[in-house]
Each structure stands twice: as structure tokens, then as C-alpha cells.
Amino acid sequence: YPNTFWMNPQYLIKLEEEDEDQEDGESGCTFLVGLIQKHRRRQRKMGEDMHTIGFGIYEVPEELTGQTNIHLSKNFFLTHRARERSDTFINLREVLNRFKLPPGEYILVPSTFEPNKDGDFCIRVFSEKKADYQVVDDEIEADLEENDASEDDIDDGFRRLFAQLAGEDAEISAFELQTILRRVLAKRQDIKSDGFSIETCRIMVDMLDSDGSAKLGLKEFYILWTKIQKYQKIYREIDVDRSGTMNSYEMRKALEEAGFKLPCQLHQVIVARFADDQLIIDFDNFVRCLVRLETLFRISKQLDSENTGTIELDLISWLCFSVL
């Protein structure tokens, strides 16, 4: 299942020293890998059986040697075969195999046999000689565009549209925004949506509300409109099966297209928060996720002016940010 296999956790194994005793006459580094399912007794009491599990071991390409912050993509696994695999995928508590490989760097990828199975596990690696093991994951990055636009960017047609939508007060509230976006999405056949929830509209307004009015003026609405068009473009391009929705395994690529690189742990949280019980993410939840991420990254950047990677919050600040 290439669409989802690459989303599994990835572990770097660095084999540095060959075995001293080459019993079979073949040089290399001997090591054991054990993949163990956790909490299965508890799950069995709930009527769930063991998952069918196994793993693959891939040689790290020369151009990526020495890097630990790159989660290998779907394209890598489509173009590279496993150097070794577990003997079988089987529904046992532990899968254990012995291997011998030349010194070098390898990626270990555990997985269930069937896609979209969630499970807890631990991995044990024993080597005859010195070796190093660590998790491989993306560094946290956000490429944020400036939330600004000049008056010259806004054409007369958009000004007339805004005046028609905003009414006498020349501002758009979250409730008015919800009505506008519902009409827009109702005309689209390539995106399945019941419209935007009022919660999503509120966080969009909050992100761009520069004067604290809880409404959007002309320039603010123009910036938001531009963002929504960008989000629509990403959503359509990532929806490769043309279902009008997005599968959870497509979300990681979509976030990267939107400028966010996130570790696996955070991707798991995002899927749990924004996907439905069929692991589908609709356009409303996709936009809500992007807006929340952008808002949190901007807050972090503002509070961490020296780019240390840490921030300090007092209780009231934490509570205010938590209700975003």
C-alpha cells in the first residue's frame, strides 16, 4: 500500500563496525530486529485481535547519508526496494529476525499488513558490534506569507463584490462569512462540502482581524479570499482520486504544499482532530487546520523573537491561546 506505507514511523540504523568472527565467510554487521505489539491483551479483552505486522529495511541513499531530519517520502519507496524484510507479516505479538548487512546507514520501517491500522509497538535492535539507532523525522518548519496587501492589488471588481457582500457597515462578520462561503462552495462540483462551520469562520476572522472588531474590512477580506483560493487549489491537486474529499494519508502532502513541515507525532494529532471516522478530511476541516496552524506559528514567532525554539507563557496567555 504505497499511499500509506511511507507515513509509518521511520528509524535510522547506523552500522559502523563489521563482526570480528565471520563464521560464514561473509563480512558484514550482524543485528537482530524485534517488533513487538503493545497492549494487545487489553485490546483482546475488547474483542480486537492481534494486528498482522512486519517491517522493511531500506538502504539510505548516498545523498541523504548523515541526515536525521528527513522523513522519506512516498516517491522514495516507489523507486527503492527494501534491502531486507521481516520473514513474514504475521499476527503475533512479536516478529523477530536476524540480518547481516555491510556497514552503512539503513532505514527501518515497521507497519501493519493492512493500511490505516492504528497500533502501539516497540522496536528492539541488538547488534554484535557498535551501532547507532534513532528516530528519523522532519524538522518543524512553516513558510508563512505576510498577511498584507496593497490597495493597488484590489481591483474594482473585487471592491464592488465586497461592497455588495458587506452591506452598510462595510465589514464582514463571521456569520456573514459563513453565508458567503456556503454559496461559493455550493457552486463547486470538485469539492464535496456542506459549507463552513461557524467555528471555522470565526478562527479565519480572528486570524486577520487587525483592529479587534471581530469583522473583516476590505483589505482583510481580500487577504482571506486569496488564502481560500490557495487552499482550494491545494485541496484539488492533492485529491488524486477525484473524490472531492481528502484521505488522511493525503494530508501530509497537502500540509507540505501549504508550507508546513511537521513531525509524525503532530500529523497523528491532526488526523485524530480533523478527520472523520472514515479517516476523511473535508474542505472545512482542511481549512480550519491550516488556519489554526498558521495562527499558532505566528504566535510562536511573535513570542520567540530570538528563534530559540521555546516560548514562555503565563497562565492567562496560555488560556487565551488555548481557546483559539
From Swiss-Prot:
A single GO cellular-component term from the record reads: dendrite
| Superkingdom assignment | Eukaryota
Which named protein is this?
Calpain-2 catalytic subunit
Q: Where in the cell is it found?
A: Cytoplasm; Cell membrane
Expressed in which tissues: Ubiquitous.
Q: Where is this region: Domain III?
A: 1-138
**Region Domain IV: what ranges?**
158-324
Q: Which residues are listed for Ca(2+) 6 binding in this entry? A: D209, D211, S213, K215, E220
The family database entries (CDD domains) matched by this protein are listed as: Calpain_III
Q: How does it assemble?
A: Forms a heterodimer with a small (regulatory) subunit (CAPNS1). Interacts with CPEB3; this leads to cleavage of CPEB3.
**In which residues is Ca(2+) 1 bound?**
D282, N285
Which species is this UniProt entry from?
A: Sus scrofa
Q: Does the keyword Calcium apply?
A: yes
EF-hand domain: from which residue to which, for each copy?
190-224, 226-261
